[in-house]
């Protein structure tokens, strides 16, 4: 019965897709249109977790995602892409959650039926999850299962990886790059694969083709401390690879893995540019994907969202009527609720002394004891009311001569959730003057005072040094400056201390740099620049100047706090 139900759901889904087939053919005016999704993490879920019946969400809390509803959300994305006139659909890795042959066969069967009915070609690359369950000959097995989704259209395939090159309409060529090492979450392009990429890129440009790249791991950092703060979030040796891509003419690369919408840019010494268009997870709030139009005079990048479930029969069993109505018709609100539920679970697991010590690479009992206290207090404070009398953050703040800026946020968790959602959605702009940054810095100052009250100056210095190590090690002079700050303020972590230490880091992550992340027009393709000594020298000095400005602003902020 269950198999029949799922088969019926698939048929109905494709019947709906047929209704948009005519749209696809007529919507190709206005350049090459490509719809791109990533990190779909599809798995077979027959029945939702029993916890749902108690008002909770039976989802994997660590992923902040609609894991139970994955297939239904994915189907809605495919239908929406067809209706919008996509010529091609790109899937940038982590198609499956566990990487089993069963999951891949299910996905492949759906894609086969979709292609046959709509005529829209689908191209895939593997992500780290896609090799998890393929224990025997994973590269070959993946290629066999997805042979019709890129490989059969390719004119060149790297046999040692699942990288391939395929010509698209409009004079474009796709370089699909498999930088995954099976059994490893890291992304890496070795010497042999890089040589293959270089050969394909040069051959394609010699034919007058314009290159579009796709791989799972980002190839450009989206903020300066990303490599240190988020383990395996970038392909190894990303900076060297990204500038190489730029000089090869790979001007646009679609990537996933980070589960957030970002567009990064890198410029080579020869003044060539690569844009890394980060594709968010389709299952995380706000259920977003990229819809990109490659035009003669520009590249239009637009964010689109799944707002409803097109085929409820693709959902698992177990919802009550109210929940089913929300899932299908108000999918965004449902996704936001799941996000909040999952974020709380993630926060509680992250606030663990052993985990934090491992994160910063410090196996030190002194640091561990400090972390234990901070984690315990953080879990308590995050749910206290921010404002009012009684046991509130505002009342505790007065004890340390701190005041909270007025805001509409009710708790620290509500603030944390709001910041995290905007970060995942893209175009984050929490500057130092924003109420979110001001309130967040004060909440952190309160946490540190509340947690480390009565501890010695040495303990405070130890804690701050540990935090410095977490963000890439000591910057010149910071150890001396941190000691001076703690000695000056004694038992109080004033807002000046926290601002001087954390504000540059938080702004680096939470203030988006150009170009925008969500809806932006990017430059059209241009001839590859060979570069000369003048352009190389200017680019070098520009990079050096920016680097030293960041260090100077950081140190200046710390010493200015000491002088106050």
Which positions does each model-derived feature cover?
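Bacterial N-terminal signal peptides that target proteins for export
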Residues: 1-11
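Non-catalytic terminal accessory segments
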Residues: 3, 26-30, 315-564
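Hydrophobic core
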Residues: 12-16, 20
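N-terminal active-site segment of His-dependent metallophosphoesterases
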Residues: 27-101
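Active-site-proximal beta-strand elements of phosphoester/diester hydrolases
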Residues: 31-45, 171-181, 214, 274-280, ...
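Active-site glycine-centered loops adjacent to acidic/histidine catalytic or metal-binding residues
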Residues: 39, 93-94, 127-128, 216, ...
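His/acidic metal-ligating clusters that form di-metal
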Residues: 82-88, 173-175, 184-275, 380-387
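Extended active-site neighborhood of metal-dependent phosphoesterases/phosphodiesterases
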Residues: 101, 105-196, 202, 270-275, ...
């Amino acid at each position: 019965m269950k198999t029949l139900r799922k088969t019926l759901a698939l048929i109905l889904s494709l019947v709906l897709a047929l209704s948009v087939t005519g749209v696809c053919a007529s919507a190709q005016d206005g350049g090459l249109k490509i719809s791109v999704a990533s990190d779909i993490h599809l798995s077979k879920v027959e029945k939702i977790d029993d916890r749902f019946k108690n008002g909770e969400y039976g989802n994997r809390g660590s992923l902040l995602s609609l894991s139970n509803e994955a297939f239904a959300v994915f189907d809605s994305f495919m239908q929406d892409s067809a209706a919008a006139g996509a010529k091609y659909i790109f899937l940038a890795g982590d198609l499956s959650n566990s990487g089993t042959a069963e999951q891949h066969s299910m996905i492949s069967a759906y894609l086969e039926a979709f292609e046959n009915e709509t005529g829209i070609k689908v191209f895939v690359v593997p992500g780290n999850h896609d090799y998890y369950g393929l224990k025997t000959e994973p590269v070959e097995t993946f290629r066999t299962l997805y042979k019709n989704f890129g490989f059969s259209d390719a004119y060149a395939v790297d046999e040692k990886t699942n990288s391939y090159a395929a010509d698209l309409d409009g004079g474009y060529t796709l370089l699909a790059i498999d930088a995954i090492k099976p059994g490893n979450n890291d992304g890496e392009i070795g010497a042999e694969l890089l040589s293959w990429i270089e050969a394909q890129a040069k051959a394609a440009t010699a034919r007058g083709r314009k290159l579009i790249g796709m791989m799972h791991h980002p190839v450009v950092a989206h903020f300066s401390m990303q490599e240190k703060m988020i383990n395996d979030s970038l392909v190894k040796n990303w900076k060297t690879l990204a500038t190489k891509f730029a000089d090869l003419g790979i001007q646009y690369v679609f990537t996933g893995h980070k589960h957030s919408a970002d567009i990064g840019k890198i410029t080579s010494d020869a003044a060539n540019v690569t844009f890394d268009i980060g594709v968010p997870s389709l299952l995380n709030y706000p259920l977003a994907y990229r819809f990109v139009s490659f035009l003669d005079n520009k590249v239009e990048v637009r964010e689109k969202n799944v707002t409803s479930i097109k085929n409820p029969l693709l959902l698992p069993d177990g919802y009550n009527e109210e929940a089913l109505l929300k899932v299908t018709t108000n999918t965004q609100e449902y996704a936001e609720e799941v996000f909040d539920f999952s974020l709380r679970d993630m926060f509680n697991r992250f606030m663990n002394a052993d985990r934090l010590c491992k994160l910063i690479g410090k196996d030190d009992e002194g640091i561990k004891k400090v972390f234990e206290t901070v984690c315990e207090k953080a879990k308590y404070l995050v749910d206290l009311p921010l404002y009012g009398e009684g046991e509130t953050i505002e009342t505790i703040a007065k004890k340390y001569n701190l005041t909270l800026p007025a805001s509409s946020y009710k708790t620290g968790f509500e603030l944390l959730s709001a910041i995290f959602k905007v970060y995942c959605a893209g175009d984050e702009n929490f500057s130092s003057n924003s109420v979110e940054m001001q309130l967040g810095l004060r909440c952190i100052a309160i946490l540190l005072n509340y947690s480390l009250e009565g501890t010695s100056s040495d303990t405070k210095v130890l804690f701050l040094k540990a935090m410095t190590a977490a963000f890439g090690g000591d910057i010149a002079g910071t150890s001396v400056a941190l000691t001076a700050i703690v000695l000056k303020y004694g038992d109080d972590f004033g807002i000046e201390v926290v601002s001087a230490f954390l504000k540059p880091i938080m702004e680096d992550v939470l203030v988006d740099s150009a170009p925008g992340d969500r809806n932006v027009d990017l430059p059209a393709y241009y001839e590859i620049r060979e570069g000369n000594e003048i352009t190389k020298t200017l680019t070098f000095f520009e990079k050096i100047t920016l680097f030293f400005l960041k260090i100077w602003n950081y140190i200046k902020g710390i010493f200015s706090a000491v002088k106050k």
